[in-house]
Amino acid sequence: MSGNAALGEAAVLAGCTCYFGYPITPQNELTEYMAKRMPEAGGIFIQSESEIAAINMVLGASVAGARAMTSSSSPGMSLKQEGISYLAADELPAVIVDMVRGGPGMGNISPAQSDYMQATRGGGHGDYKTIVLAPGSVQELTEIVPLAFDLADQYRNPVIILGDGMLGQMMEPVSFDDIKPPKVYQKDYVLTGALGRPSRMVRSLLFDTKEEEEHNWKLFRKYQRIEQNEVRYESYMLDDAEMVAIAYGIGARIVKGAIKRLRQDNLKIGMIRPITLWPFPSKVI
């Protein structure tokens, strides 16, 4: 199964009920798969008129309580950044897939890792963070998707799955047996109509400077909790390592092959593969 298709199926099994996207290579197979599977699963699929529209549809679905997802590739992710900043400021969960291609500019459709800084530093305006997960195989991709939705709901924060064109289009055996039914999170912020309760407001426009400062401190404390609790990484041949390589995603698979070859020459090399690019496993390194 291709990485893009496997990602789509994992999202359906993880309880995704809304998908909004706009075509761009090399993630088109995911959009095509969701166009078929979302109606079958009783969900909503909309091919939006633009990447900007797609991310704002995600915001609308999330504020109504849905598990919502969108996907794109590098130039399209640039267009989504304002909406991602709004999601972070509004504390709304969402899963955003970036199958990275070469850049800058329009670049090309070859796989790349050139969106790393954009994803891990908060690519839009304002000081915010997105949780960033970097799978290294199609099977791991299917395992990361449910985790992404759970982390998004748990922390009320957008989560980015950072893949690349190779991972999205390569074919590998996959199993979905370990995907559990989606967890149910209490979402007391969703806009469902004021049915015998005080009205709710989800907003990021804060004219009062003191109110905005307090809100940003609240976000900062949340980011600290994420850094304390959600660091994930893989250790590879570290027990006797004298040199350690750091690599993530598909690139880490290439590094593993190089390490095996170099160890035949008695070079003691190991690897740390960050699975969360943010929060980054800095203390381990």
What does each model-found stretch correspond to?
Residues M1-G122, K129:
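Thiamine diphosphate
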Residues S2-A6, F220-M243, K256:
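Glycine-/acidic-rich phosphate or pyrophosphate-binding loops and their flanking alpha/beta elements
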Residues A35-R37, S85-A88, P146-L151, F176-I179, ...:
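Short, solvent-exposed amphipathic alpha-helical segments in soluble enzyme
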Residues R101-G103, G163-M170, G249-G251:
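Glycine-rich beta-alpha junction loops
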Residues S110-D164:
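Conserved thiamine diphosphate
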Residues R156-S235:
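Conformationally flexible catalytic loops at phosphate/diphosphate-handling active centers
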Residues Q228-E230, L267-K268, I272-L277:
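Catalytic-core signal marking the mid-to-C-terminal active-site face
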Residues L238-L267, W278-I285:
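Redox- and metal-dependent alpha/beta enzyme cores, enriched for Fe-S-associated oxidoreductases
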